[in-house]
Amino acid sequence: MQKVVLATGNAGKVRELASLLSDFGLDVVAQTELGVDSAEETGLTFIENAILKARHAAKMTGLPAIADDSGLAVDVLGGAPGIYSARYSGENATDQQNLEKLLHTLRDVPDDKRQARFHCVLVYLRHAEDPTPIVCHGSWPGVITRQAAGNGGFGYDPIFFVPSEGKTAAELTREEKSAISHRGQALKLLLDALRNG
């Protein structure tokens, strides 16, 4: 199996990606397991931040790297929280604090104006100086609920209602979520690119 460093310390992302990538013959190791600290996310887009993270992990480990930068974009908020999704309530905010802040911010927004979209950008670098990274983007439309429902997933999943499924992302099984989510879409594109590239 090809060893690849996953440029994240987010346990939810590690679980989700490692199981899917192992089926493809990739032995995924989280950067934290290799003693690599997080890259500074100075980009203004999901793509910029994913490339920064992948390049940092590849440079520090000498391994190929995969990085994920993802977040929630709420239409009525002009795309916020966007790249700041993980720290919407502050630098060391918990998922629950971020979720509560978003619900509070949207408290007066009518139900028909609560559309949102999860975005995920996955970047694969063969090495730290790779001039042609593979960049894949997936997006997943939904609606922000007024209260949390479900115990699965992580982040904003309990308040992200998926109309096609009739439930929140946190109420979906891992398999259901992987088949339709932003991360599942981006990963499928990445695996296709790796197969063909």
UniProtKB/Swiss-Prot annotation:
Keyword terms of this UniProt record: Hydrolase, Magnesium, Metal-binding, Nucleotide metabolism, Nucleotide-binding
GO cellular component assignments: cytoplasm; cytosol
Superkingdom of origin organism: Bacteria
Signal sequence interval, chain numbering: none
Cofactors: Mg(2+)
Pfam families, per database record: Ham1p_like (PF01725)
Cell wall biogenesis/degradation in keyword set: no
KW ATP-binding (keyword) present: no
Entry binding sites for substrate: 8-13, 70, 154-157, 177, 182-183
Residues annotated as binding Mg(2+): 40, 69
EC numbers on record: 3.6.1.66
Gene Ontology biological process terms from the UniProt entry: nucleoside triphosphate catabolic process; nucleotide metabolic process; purine nucleoside triphosphate catabolic process
Protein known as: dITP/XTP pyrophosphatase
Gene name per UniProt: rdgB
